[in-house]
Amino acid sequence: MLFDVRDTGARLKPGSGIRPTVTNVDLRFHNDNSYNETPPEFVCLLCLHPAMQGGISQVMSVATAHAALEQRHPELMARLYRPFWYDRHAEHQPGEPTTFAAPMFERGADGTTKARLALSEIHAGYELRGERLDNETAAALAAVQSVFDQPELHVELGFAPGQIQYVNNRATGHARTEFTDFPEPERKRHLVRLWLRDAGRRGYRG
């Protein structure tokens, strides 16, 4: 599935269907499509035009993040393996629920740790449902954010025209810094994203 990643001038609002990928905002560590039943296993980003300033890509290993959480917040690990509510960004049929429940971490069939990192979608999911975060849930999300904020746990990668970045979407989290575009429309930041799966149906929901 192909998608153009560029700033459209839209602004984020829970339930609106507007995703950070069509804005220029700082996009924290996440796994693409975490709010879907079957997120893609791999994400590819082709750079057509980089930003004038910012838009730096950051990548963090899920195993590294998980180990840091186990070391620093062992009392919260059980909560991270229980479901959270995610905003589905209006990517569903009319009449379907606007939120999706899933744990942030799970063990794959091969024993590896897989993730659904998407803190903004989780906060928006609870807002859409009119539910307040209980103390344990709020503490768990804050703990994950604290790990995201550790620069030594991730790598930074710039983009140049023609470069392609491939990441394992369930084994790594990726992020993007806020960016400023060139004033000329033809020079604005533009990436083309490709989602890939090894299994499941060919449609969006897999």
Report residues per predicted region.
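Active-site environment of non-heme Fe oxygenases that use a 2-His-1-carboxylate facial triad
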Residues: 2-166, 170-206
